[in-house]
Each structure stands twice: as C-alpha cells, then as structure tokens.
C-alpha cells in the first residue's frame, strides 16, 4: 500500500518534544557529546508524524527532528472523537494497543503515546503500552498502530458489503 504524501505547508502543525537524550561517541581523545531529540508534529485534525534528530546543540536537534517529522506525516481516520477500531502497533521491543473509547473518556495514555494521540486530534481513546518503554520505540509503535486504522467505508468496500452491514 503506497501512502500518499501529505504537504506540511498546507497544515497548521503543532509540535511536541517527546524526549531529549545526550549521546556520546567515544573517540581517541575522549567523548564527543551530541543531543538526540524525538518530536511529534500534528494538526489535531487527523494528521500526525514523528521524527528524530541529532546535533551538537539541543535546539538544532529539535529543529532536525521537526523537519524529519514533517516528512513522515500520516493521515489518521477519526470517527467522531475516537478511532474506528482496535489496533496493535509493533516497533522494536515496544508494542502499543489502542482502543476506541466512548465520548467523554478522554485520552487514557502514557507520555509518548499521549503526545501522538493528542496531536493526531483523537479526543477519546484507551491505550496500553506493552514491552519496552523506550520513548522512540513507543512513538513509532503508536504511529504503526494508527497506520493500521481503516475508515468504515474502506472496510465495507474491501469486503464488498454496504456501509450499513459493517456498522450494524
């Protein structure tokens, strides 16, 4: 399945820094320090992306991560205030389970998953992070779970049924 490219210039994107980490490369003369940043961007209206950036200074790492996140935007199908169905996303040793929730529930999610869900524009959702809690892997596992979501119309078309038969 080929993802259609989303133009970030057309969207009013907000960004949120999920994690900043100091990383070191050991060389002959000692350690070379750099900073690694993970950023999530979204328009709170069904578009979200995550990016990773590394640089000698924190602001540069964040800027690079934002640019990377804008290159990896995905569209999330939202039904009312929640998602259409359950999904499980896997990335590395992290697994994230996302479930639709009734209106008024709110975003029940941990730090990294919460950032992705809120910037995607999902108002009501239940999530569970399983396995590794490494923020980078959790963010990517959440994005993988959101990529699996299909609109009810798409499911009906794929099964060769009417929308009423699917929703009942």
From Swiss-Prot:
A GO term for molecular function: structural constituent of ribosome
An example GO CC term for this entry is: small ribosomal subunit
Q: Which Pfam families match?
A: Ribosomal_S5, Ribosomal_S5_C
Domain (S5 DRBM) spans 13-76
UniProt keyword annotation of Ribosomal protein present: yes
Which GO terms fall under biological process for this protein?
translation
Q: Which InterPro entries match?
A: Ribosomal_Su5_D2-typ_SF, Ribosomal_uS5, Ribosomal_uS5_bac-type, Ribosomal_uS5_C, Ribosomal_uS5_N, Ribosomal_uS5_N_CS, Ribsml_uS5_D2-typ_fold_subgr
- The positions making up the signal sequence are none
Kindly state which keywords UniProt assigns to this record, in alphabetical order: Ribonucleoprotein, Ribosomal protein, RNA-binding, rRNA-binding
Please report which protein family the annotation says this sequence is part of: Belongs to the universal ribosomal protein uS5 family.
**What does the protein in this record do?**
With S4 and S12 plays an important role in translational accuracy. Located at the back of the 30S subunit body where it stabilizes the conformation of the head with respect to the body.
Subunit-level organization: Part of the 30S ribosomal subunit. Contacts proteins S4 and S8.
| Free-text comment on this protein's domains from its UniProt entry | The N-terminal domain interacts with the head of the 30S subunit; the C-terminal domain interacts with the body and contacts protein S4. The interaction surface between S4 and S5 is involved in control of translational fidelity.
For this entry, the protein name equals Small ribosomal subunit protein uS5
Organism name: Caldicellulosiruptor saccharolyticus (strain ATCC 43494 / DSM 8903 / Tp8T 6331)
Gene designation: rpsE
